[in-house]
């Protein structure tokens, strides 16, 4: 007699923190996880986050432990919200600088700084620039401590358009075009 083939259990994972919904409370994004779960799986939300379910879960705790758990949850939520706000402010203040630098006579290089603030891998972006503009593009360290992408040729305008088109998370207002000219030696 053939045994029935075992069927795998279907597990739902949170769309926000990627943990099973039962463990979302241990992550830092509990509020967002609850909203996601309520929208996508209302039956599971009712089972985990309904007032009755929460009451049943905390009923076995002592009064002091319940208060401590409530304080911890509030503190964790506030901390996560503050971190998210800080990240949003950092992104709003971050500026991508595209600088056209004259090398000699009619030769130029274009320097791009500030992309790391938007979570982009500079090596991948440099490779994309090299492919798109058919030029050499490399990541170099800046004396001030950061890194920049140096692209051979005068492609500053095209780089701005490319960044806006390919990387939608960079706002247009945060891109700054700058032109550096070498000072001519005075004949005297």
UniProtKB/Swiss-Prot annotation:
Task: Decide whether keyword Nucleotide-binding is in the record.
Answer: no
Task: List this protein's GO terms for biological process.
Answer: formation of translation preinitiation complex; nuclear-transcribed mRNA catabolic process, nonsense-mediated decay; ribosome disassembly; translation reinitiation
**Location in or out of the cell:** Cytoplasm
InterPro entries xref list: DENR/SUI1_TIF, DENR_C, DENR_eukaryotes, DENR_N, SUI1, SUI1_dom_sf
The family assignment reads: Belongs to the DENR family.
Question: Could you give the domain comment from the record?
Answer: The SUI1 domain may be involved in RNA binding.
This protein is called: Translation machinery-associated protein 22
Q: Which organism is it from?
A: Chaetomium globosum (strain ATCC 6205 / CBS 148.51 / DSM 1962 / NBRC 6347 / NRRL 1970)
From which lineage does this chain's organism come?
Eukaryota, Fungi, Dikarya, Ascomycota, Pezizomycotina
